[in-house]
Amino acid sequence: MPLKLTTYYHGKDIPELPGKNTFHSKELFLIYEATPGYTPLLIVATEDGRPVARLLAAIRKAKKWLPSSLVKHCVVYSEGEFLDESLSTNKEKAEEVFGDMLEHLTQEASRSCVLIEFRNLNNSMFGYRVFRTNDYFPVNWLRVRNSLHSMEKTEDRFSPSRMRQIKKGLKNGAKVEEAHTVEE
């Protein structure tokens, strides 16, 4: 039987679903729904009436000088949650299901968003082909965090390749800031 995709816009409409991933849960959907400036949407893939995967996206408004209709941003954490155990072992089928959900999300979110961003992908190569098919592109991002208990010779802790990456980043406009509080 073909895959059926259902999009939920309101928490009261979402049925109880199996799964343990907090980033694609009904609970997080309800939190986004109650938060001003956020509009969540949950895509659930079902096969033969049983849920096999889900993907939660949050559309947020940025409070900038531009009109809010121009600066809506859709964020998805990881590649979704696969509820069917057979998808965990069959990567090709998992990518096919993810590709269908990604295409559906792209159609839904591109109506109101300028940017759709996937963060914290578990495997950077998972779904690469379907991302490219849907006109997504990778962005190189380097975040370096180190505990600096002793301030002497901090550079000695970095490998030569990490030092090259940092120098290249600084040359290309990256900023280095020292954290003074826990919040930073």
Where does each model-flagged region fall?
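Short, flexible loop/turn elements at secondary-structure junctions
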Residues: 47, 59, 120-122, 148-150, ...
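Short, solvent-exposed polar/charged micro-motifs at secondary-structure junctions
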Residues: 15-16, 126-129, 184
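Hydrophobic, Leu/Ile/Phe/Ala-enriched alpha-helical segments that form helix-helix packing faces
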Residues: 14, 18, 31-32, 101-109, ...
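Amide-forming acyltransferase catalytic core, primarily the GNAT-like/NAT-type
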Residues: 1-79
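Acyltransferase donor/substrate-recognition loop-hinge adjacent to the catalytic core
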Residues: 1-9, 130-184
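A structural signal for short, well-ordered beta-strand segments and their strand-loop junctions
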Residues: 44, 51-56, 114-120, 177-178
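Acyl-donor binding region in acyl/amide transferases
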Residues: 63-138
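Sequence-level motif detector for i,i+2 pairs with an aromatic at +2
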Residues: 38-40, 52, 113, 139-143, ...
